[in-house]
């Protein structure tokens, strides 16, 4: 599947940022240089200054409206990210999903050779791609010190499989001793990167040796202190966030306006937005509107026999 014009622009923005990052390892400086190329100031009156949330780790966000193809963008971005890294770096990606349903959908689509996501990955990496679930990783299924040197390996997990209070982290299997991963401990000897008090054969320790590229889907759900600790524990080499609604602590490298989606026929129905002055009025008006739509739906059912159930969706605050 060919990228839409706005998606190509997002990838071009990422490439431009990666180029400035290669010129200067100072994250704040490379961020300023990136925006200066666009004649946009950083700081007062311009875009926010770079936020070094995971100290020393480049972390940027693609702000793309819902329905804009964030997953395809992420798949297309992976090669560009690895291209700016040393060629000998293991091509490991930890892909974090916010829920079990999105996890299952992501695993299915990334693994399906007929799906555009998998086709994009196969094209960029010559078909040398494997997608692993948490169970496969813990069992060492297709995951070895040798395989990560030659194959793009994408590990798909949920936030909750990693995110836990540090005092209880050993309740999670990725922090537990794992004989299936013992060959990694024999192959990698840099003890300085190890997480203190954690068995060296634990999956989290393997990741820390390999320093994966980490993709955070719906990253607005991963802003809590526990989420920051989760990312620190992974010890990534690069973080790519995907969301339609970034929080204030995100470094947004590329913005897509909803009108761009409409131009590309990605939005099939009109989007109508009303502004209200308080949360209470938003809730009351939304429920009342749903009630009016319900009445019309019942009238339609009486005529056609077809029932349409109107619903209201309220987005909860992340934990």
What are these regions (language model features)?
Residues 88-122, 158-164, 317:
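Conserved Walker A/P-loop ATP-binding site and its immediately adjacent core
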Residues 118-179, 192-194:
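Inter-Walker segment of RecA-like/P-loop motor cores
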Residues 161-164, 171-240:
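SF2 helicase catalytic motif II
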Residues 252-319:
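Conserved interdomain linker/interface between the two RecA-like ATPase lobes of SF2 helicase motors
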Residues 61-63, 94, 313:
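Short hydrophobic/aromatic beta-strand immediately N-terminal to the Walker A/P-loop
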Residues 62-68, 218-222, 232-250, 265:
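Conserved helicase ATPase motor motifs in RecA-like P-loop NTPase domains
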Residues 1-63:
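Conserved pre-motif I regulatory segment
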Residues 70-81:
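Motif I (Walker A/P-loop) of helicase-class P-loop NTPases
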């Amino acid at each position: 599947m060919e990228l839409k014009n706005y998606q190509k622009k997002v990838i071009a923005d990422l490439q431009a940022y990666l180029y400035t990052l290669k010129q200067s390892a100072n994250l704040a400086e490379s961020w300023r240089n990136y925006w200066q190329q666009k004649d946009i100031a950083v700081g007062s009156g311009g875009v926010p200054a770079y936020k070094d949330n995971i100290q020393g780790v480049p972390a940027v966000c693609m702000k793309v409206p819902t329905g804009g193809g964030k997953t395809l963008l992420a798949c297309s971005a992976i090669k560009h990210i690895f291209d700016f890294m040393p060629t000998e770096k293991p091509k490991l990606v930890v892909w974090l999903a916010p829920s079990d349903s999105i996890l299952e959908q992501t695993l299915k689509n990334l693994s399906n050779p007929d799906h555009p996501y998998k086709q994009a990955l196969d094209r960029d990496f010559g078909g040398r791609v494997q997608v692993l679930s948490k169970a496969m990783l813990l069992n060492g299924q297709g995951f070895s010190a040798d395989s990560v040197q030659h194959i793009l390996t994408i590990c798909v997990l949920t936030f909750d499989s990693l995110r836990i209070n540090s005092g209880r982290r050993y309740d999670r299997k990725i922090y537990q001793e794992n004989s299936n991963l013992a060959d990694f401990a024999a192959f990698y000897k840099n003890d300085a990167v190890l997480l203190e008090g954690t068995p060296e054969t634990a999956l989290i320790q393997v990741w820390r040796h390999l320093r994966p590229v980490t993709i955070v889907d719906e990253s607005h759900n991963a802003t809590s202190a526990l989420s920051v600790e989760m990312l620190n524990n992974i010890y990534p080499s690069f973080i790519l966030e995907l969301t339609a609604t970034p929080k204030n602590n995100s470094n947004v490298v590329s913005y897509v306006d909803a009108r761009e989606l409409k131009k590309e026929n990605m939005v099939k129905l009109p989007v109508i937005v009303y502004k209200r002055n308080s949360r209470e009025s938003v809730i009351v008006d939304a429920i009342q509107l749903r009630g009016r739509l319900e009445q019309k739906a019942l009238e339609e059912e009486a005529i056609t026999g077809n029932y349409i159930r109107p619903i209201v969706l309220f987005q909860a605050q992340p934990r």
